Each structure stands twice: as C-alpha cells, then as structure tokens.
Design a protein with these regions (language model features):
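Active-site-adjacent helix/loop segment of glycosyltransferases
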Residues: 121
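Blade-loop segments of beta-propeller domains
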Residues: 75-80
Length: 306
C-alpha cells in the first residue's frame, strides 16, 4: 500500500480550495432548501441552507461532534453568513429531523452539477459515441459499525444488525463522478429492489453497465423497452439458445442468442453474447447492442467488457 506523502500544509491548502469551490456553488442566495416550516407557519431562525452547508464544512474541516456545528453557525459564522442565535439543542433537533434529508440532497445535487460543468473539458466523450451517456450501476454493503454504544455491545460480532445498510448508486463513466446514490436500510436487500428508481437518474439512450446484482431477464427487457443500451456479465448456469454467429475462433465468440432455453422463461428480446479470454481468465458478457459495428471487441475496446 502506498503511503500518503502529502504534507499537512498541502492538505490544508487542498481543503481551503475545496471549501472555496463549495462556497461558490452553494453559498449564493439563489439556492432555496427551506421547504418545511414550523407548525406556527414561521420560518426557522436558522435557514436550512446554512445548517446543512455547515454540516458539509464540518466534515471538510474534520469536526468530530455536533457541538462544533452549533458553534460554527451560532458563534463563529462562515462564508458570508452571520451568526444565528439558536441553542445547541435546536441544532441537534434539526440534525435529527428526517426532513433534513431533502435539504442535504439538494446541496449534493448542486455540487454534483457544478462539478460536471468543470469536468466537461475532460469528459471521455469518445466512449460509446452511439449512446447518450455511459453509466455504471452498482451496490455495496456498508462496513459494520463498532460496538461502542451499550445497546450494540449486546449484539454478537458478525450479526447483520451491526450493518448500517447498503448503498446503491449510478456512476457517470464519461465524467468519472457519481450521479445518484441511494441508501437501503436493509443490508440484505436485493439491488434489483431499486433498479427502476435508479433509471430515473439515467438519460434515455444511455449505455448502462450493470453489476450481477441486477441480473434478471425482466430487468434487461425493461431497459430495452425503455430505450436504454446495456452490458452485463453472463451469470453462470444461465441457459440460452444460439441464434446467429458473427465470429468464432477458439474461446472468442460474438453472436446473437435468446436468454432462456425454453419459451416459458425466455427473455423478450434477443441479445448479443461476447466471450473471450485474457490469459487464463475467461469472460462472458451479454448486451442489447446487437450490431458489432456499434460496440466492437478488440484490444482498444476490451476495457468496456472488463
């Protein structure tokens, strides 16, 4: 593992640059995230934009407690925001309010869109030029939490109750940035549970690189029916029927197949099967990009299939 050789001063400079970028993106008055009012109808003393921007700054500056967030917004102030006369408990209550999720999400979307504008000159627009965009979808179970709290000490090590859930996201391959991220409270939840929700973040006509956690014939048909291109690894023991061979030489194959050997469990659309070997490793992929001229398999493009 490579050691981090960045000096403390350089780290501080990087953090300041990031904070300046964030202030430019979300520090203006044109972004409103105050969608919820008090029961009395009055606006909260501490605007949601200030509170949740403060949370982001707290993470960037390495704060370790909610008390430091309260001090930031009520004592010190930051950016062009003045101090807000609120109690520490008021800040704690706001941070625990589930409605704050929408405000934080709005801030993250602003940062995401701002980053995309800056990354535009470096975007890999030559990747799969036939597609509107190129996106990868994947899910990952979060690491277990430490058993510091009394209630958690009673939970056996290895119990799924120690897992804080999982995240499932959409990654923009051309721009090399996350476009959407969802949290699932159940760590054992199947990724396919949120598959259709993820599609809302992906423009029609895009190429979707699907992880095996999303593998299912109905999912592939849904993508095709809704105007998406897709690529997926072929799951072991999946049956299929050969339709046409474009090319075959040893372990290398390119052709059309029906997923599902029998009509009762067959996918609605024919797909393209591509297989090849690199060293001793054999790869098998399926895609609805059925024209070999659109998505070729050679040394230059093999990264698509890996």
């Amino acid at each position: 593992m490579n050691k981090d050789t960045t000096t403390p001063q350089k780290k501080e400079n990087i953090a300041q640059d990031i904070e300046g970028f964030l202030q430019e993106l979300i520090g203006g008055n044109d972004l409103s995230v105050d969608k919820h009012r008090k029961p009395s109808g009055r606006k909260a003393i501490l605007p949601a934009l200030v509170l949740w921007s403060g949370v982001i700054i707290a993470v960037l500056r390495g704060f370790s407690s909610q008390l430091q967030i309260w001090r930031l917004v009520s004592w010190e102030g930051f950016w062009h925001y003045s101090q807000y006369p609120v109690t520490d408990q008021a800040v704690y209550n706001r941070l625990a309010d589930e409605r704050g999720q929408e405000a934080m999400q709005a801030l993250f979307y602003r940062v995401r869109d701002g980053l995309k504008e800056r990354l535009a000159p470096y975007a890999q627009q030559k990747l799969a030029t036939f597609a509107t965009g190129v996106y990868a979808i994947d899910g990952s179970t979060l690491d277990k939490v430490a058993r510091h709290l009394p209630k958690l000490r009673e939970v056996a090590n290895g119990d799924s109750k120690l897992l804080p859930g999982k995240i499932v996201g959409v990654f923009d391959v051309r721009y090399q940035q996350w476009r959407e991220m969802l949290h699932l409270a159940n760590p054992n939840q199947n990724d396919k549970f949120v598959a259709t929700r993820l599609l809302k973040a992906i423009p029609v006509g895009s190429l979707v690189l699907a992880d095996l956690g999303f593998f299912s014939f109905p999912w592939f048909d849904t993508l095709t029916d809704n105007g998406y291109w897709w690529i997926s690894r072929l799951r072991n023991k999946v049956t299929y029927e050969m339709i046409h061979t474009f090319y075959q030489n040893g372990d290398t194959f390119d052709g059309l197949i029906w997923l599902g050997k029998y009509r009762a469990d067959r996918a609605a659309h024919a797909v393209r099967l591509v297989t090849f070997s690199i060293g001793k490793v054999h790869f098998r992929y399926i895609t609805n990009v059925r024209n070999p001229l659109q998505l070729t398999v050679n040394n230059h493009h093999q990264r698509w299939w890996l």
